Amino acid sequence: MAVAIEAPFHVLAVDDSLPDRKLIERLLKTSSFQVTTVDSGSKALEFLGLHDHEDSPISTQSDQQEVGVNLIITDYCMPGMTGYDLLKKIKESSYLRDIPVVIMSSDNIPSRINRCLEEGADEFFLKPVRLSDMSKLKPHILKSRCKEHYQQEQHLQSNSESNNSSNPTSENSSSSTSTNSHKRKAVDEEILPHTIRPRHS
């Protein structure tokens, strides 16, 4: 009997520095993650199907499912769009906001770290990123999946209740038909004893 093998989690790594990008890619693959790397925030948004100047997706729902990114890890200091700007774009998007985002930076600046965490970042790693940091990623992915599963269940339940409440006429109709049938039967039973009389020989 064949055993189903679970697909590895897919991480999108964003960093304008080639050496840093190669390092994070190697660490992620060593930790059994599927990895896609890009060198800018705008390319990350393009890969995710989002304009870098709009909140609306440019891809269809099936395209989004094919991308299937489970987590985004991005450098903070990048030319053009910073990691913080990318984080804000993701959290402002209705269909990307639940993807966990991890920020990386060489600078240990508390105000920067707090700002990213307040904006919705799940972790803030100081560079150089270590292999031990990779173990912190999976819990965020699993938490996001549980949340997504719960939201899907709530959506299905809401649709089911909506469908049930939109069809009361059919139930009332059948109930009314049944009531009328009982009334006719009762009337017939009252009439029968008076109309059928015994014959005298």
Swiss-Prot record:
Q: What is the lineage of its organism?
A: Eukaryota, Viridiplantae, Streptophyta, Embryophyta, Tracheophyta
Keyword Ligase in the entry? The reply is: no
Name listed for the protein in its UniProt record? Two-component response regulator ORR10
What family is it from? Belongs to the ARR family. Type-A subfamily.
InterPro entries according to UniProt: ARR-like, CheY-like_superfamily, Sig_transdc_resp-reg_receiver
**Keyword Transcription among record annotations:** yes
Report the GO terms under cellular component: nucleus
Q: Where is this region: Disordered?
A: 149-201
Record localization:
Nucleus
Q: How is it modified after translation?
A: Two-component system major event consists of a His-to-Asp phosphorelay between a sensor histidine kinase (HK) and a response regulator (RR). In plants, the His-to-Asp phosphorelay involves an additional intermediate named Histidine-containing phosphotransfer protein (HPt). This multistep phosphorelay consists of a His-Asp-His-Asp sequential transfer of a phosphate group between first a His and an Asp of the HK protein, followed by the transfer to a conserved His of the HPt protein and finally the transfer to an Asp in the receiver domain of the RR protein.
Which CDD domains does the annotation name? REC_typeA_ARR
Domain Response regulatory: where?
Answer: 10-142
Q: Which UniProt keywords apply?
A: Cytokinin signaling pathway, Nucleus, Phosphoprotein, Transcription, Transcription regulation, Two-component regulatory system
UniProt record, GO biological process: cytokinin-activated signaling pathway; phosphorelay signal transduction system
Q: Which residues carry this modification: 4-aspartylphosphate?
A: 75
The record's annotation in Pfam families points to: Response_reg
Give the disruption phenotype, in one or two sentences: Dwarf, viviparous, lesion mimic and sterility phenotypes.
Please state, per the UniProt record, what induces or represses the expression of this protein: By cytokinin in roots and shoots.
Function, please? Functions as a response regulator involved in His-to-Asp phosphorelay signal transduction system. Phosphorylation of the Asp residue in the receiver domain activates the ability of the protein to promote the transcription of target genes. Type-A response regulators seem to act as negative regulators of the cytokinin signaling.
Bias (Low complexity) ranges: 158-180
Q: Which organism is it from?
A: Oryza sativa subsp. japonica
